Amino acid sequence: MRVADVPGLPGGVADHFEGEGVEELYPPQAEAVERGVTEGANLVASVPTASGKTLIAQLAMLSAIAEGGDSPTFSGDGTALYIVPLRALAGEKAQEFEAFERFGLSVGVSTGNYERDGARLADNDIVVATSEKVDSLVRNGAGWIDDLSCVVADEVHLVDDDHRGPTLEVTLAKLRQQVADLQVVALSATVGNAGELAAWLDAELVDSDWRPIELRTGVHYGQSLHYDDGTQAELSVGSGSQTAAVVADTLADDGSTLVFVNSRRNAEASARRLADVTGNALSSAERERLADIAAEIRGVSDTETSDELADAVASGAAFHHAGLAREHRELVEEAFRDRLVKAVSATPTLAAGVNTPARRVVVRDWQRYDGTAGGMQPLDVLEVHQMFGRAGRPGLDPYGEAVLLANSHDELEELFDRYVYADPEPVRSKLAAEPALRTHVLAAIATGFTTTEDGLHEFLGGTLYATQTDDTGRLRSVTGDVLRYLDRNGFVERDGAALRATATGQLVSRLYVDPMSAATIIDGLRDAARDATETDDEGAFRPASELGDDAALPADASVEPTPLGLYHLVSRTPDMYELYLRSGDREQYTEVAYEHEDELLGATPREEQAEFEDWLSALKTARLMADWASELDEERIAERYDVGPGDIRGKVETAEWLLNAAERLAGELDVECGPAVREARKRVQYGVREELLGLAGVRNVGRKRARRLYNAGVESRADLRNADKGVVLGAVRGRAATAERILETVGHPDPGMDGVAADTDAAPESGGEAGGDEGQASLGDFS
């Protein structure tokens, strides 16, 4: 089918796609059109990576936005929503869709700040957002949601994910219930039960294994590649590793390689080794460009991880994992797409939709550690096939190859049976679990989706879980447990079968925190206000909501919790991923707990209780935040806690979000600790001590420049407004444009830097950096 023959598209759209080189539709795309995707039909497209799923979504969205019957135009009020699983994908997709601005359409993107209603998005024709953001928009009453004409769910097979799957599942169920005549288009990898997904969404199904270029899969063993069609190709290993040999073989054919490993450490170690291979394949021009990229990488953060990544990139290799800063990952992805970086060693996060195809994919590690199982477990077929799907770049590669590595003949046969010849597993709903249901049940009640228990069960009947089971007993049982929990903690009230969210429950839903997180925070704030560190039953956990009326707060309750106490409080919530305790940490942090016991909020478990280790893990996480807020260098924090810059920033962002929730909840409880919580939040947000809060909040200043300015005598925003320009220029290390922007922000009467000399005393090499004072005491400096 030619794109010009697609029905339902306004004039000029077909010409646009033809100008982009799309004249003939791929078979799955043509089948989607035949099944009515441009005429309002719901559709599930279960097709391999790089087989044109995005174009199916674009055709659906553009036709849904348009109005006018046989001669459609973009003059209607419809809005298309594109849901992505990752923040990184949101920006990438929004950039793709900006090509449609030529038709007068506007594109918006939203991924953060879950408490806002997204009113600014109302004027957009296409909105790109994560499922969590869409869920929060519904909770906060975003009016434009009612104007949706089409919603696209990318990577919908991720409903199978324990953590994020329930949110995507419930969000789609909410949208279908809230918005009349909403078209739903779900894009999925090839899965074992695409028909069930289609039945859930009342959708047409396109289920295809077609790819635009050939994908050859196989296993390397000994000195040969064994392919799925029974053929073999010689690939000698020699004295090196299998991975290095496969990468070298790919380079000899001017191809690039993605290597998937099972841990961050393995990704970094693999990249270091592969740099010796890729470095020999670089031209002088490539070396120059890679040197510039390496310099950019070093500028992202002052950490060993940043330096190691830069060293690898300079030689044409890289690693990619969640411990990297966002800027690191973007630089690596762009350099790989530009064919400057020849090999990337990555954890499976890179297979989750980010557009980084390669000539050859190597799945080096097909097992990873599973803490629940207590050992190494094989990866799912679906996950490995997602990695396979990254092989082959349409328009750039004549074919793609995906290779597993075997160390024995038995393993060779096992890998063929387990992955090469196997079909992917069916996706299964993960909704019927109490942690998944807590937040969604509260939100359904708080937003008025349901006002009775029967109504709640009817709403949940629109989920994938309900489609996949004939036995609703488990879901009803777990839902009953959740309702009792929400009632006991004061988030909902039950009057017979009637359900109503309390004011606190309404707030918790809008804040988008797990109700258990909110209960933990509330208990801690109430405990602080009572100045109590023990419960009646020593060592037992009892929520404040269970203590009875005699434990009510005094009318003038006032408390000043410390930053460490607040950081520990939010680190104990299920919304925070705690740091693991390493060997020797238990004794060390037990000592810290005794030293700071008066600061720590809420009940403390006894040392012999199972909960004690999690409690200590939260204390370790809190100490990281306290070090950050005390201006300790990022490099020292990374070394002390064995984390990457991305981990630090992730913990900081989560802490800021949870402390904002704590501040709002303190106001709801009339506990007058709002200023203390706000200060702790601001300090962790900017990574500074109290005296720098005013300066660090100025755009383009940040923690290090704020400390330099303060040490040079510029101690406040008012001081900065009238500061000596040479001092400001020195504090930003001679960057005139940056100095001008800072002075313009604060309203300096003459921000220009022409002829201004930098005051070198304002930029000392040591002692003036954030955390640069090596004599500075820190919470982490204990024996």
Swiss-Prot record:
- Give the location of motif DEAH box in residue numbers: 154-157
**GO terms for molecular function, please?**
3'-5' DNA helicase activity; ATP binding; ATP hydrolysis activity; DNA binding
Q: Name one GO biological process term.
A: DNA repair
Name the positions where ATP binds.
Answer: 29, 47-54
The Helicase C-terminal domain, residue ranges: 242-443
Which keywords has UniProt assigned to this entry? ATP-binding, DNA damage, DNA repair, DNA-binding, Helicase, Hydrolase, Isomerase, Nucleotide-binding
What Enzyme Commission number(s) apply to this enzyme? 5.6.2.4
**Enzyme class (EC, first level):** isomerase
As its record notes, the protein acts as a catalyst of:
Couples ATP hydrolysis with the unwinding of duplex DNA by translocating in the 3'-5' direction; ATP + H2O = ADP + phosphate + H(+)
Q: Does GTP-binding count among this protein's keywords?
A: no
Can you give the residue ranges of the Helicase ATP-binding domain? Answer: 34-209
> Looking at the record, which segments are called Disordered?
744-783
Q: Which InterPro entries match?
A: DEAD/DEAH_box_helicase_dom, Hel308-like_dom4, Hel308_SKI2-like, Helicase_ATP-bd, Helicase_C-like, Helicase_Hel308, P-loop_NTPase, WH_DNA-bd_sf
Q: Does the keyword S-adenosyl-L-methionine apply?
A: no
Tell me how this protein assembles: Monomer.
Family under the similarity heading: Belongs to the helicase family. Hel308 subfamily.
Described by its record, this protein's role is as follows: DNA-dependent ATPase and 3'-5' DNA helicase that may be involved in repair of stalled replication forks.
Q: Which HAMAP family match?
A: Helicase_Hel308
The protein depicted here goes by the name: ATP-dependent DNA helicase Hel308
Q: Which organism is it from?
A: Halobacterium salinarum (strain ATCC 700922 / JCM 11081 / NRC-1)
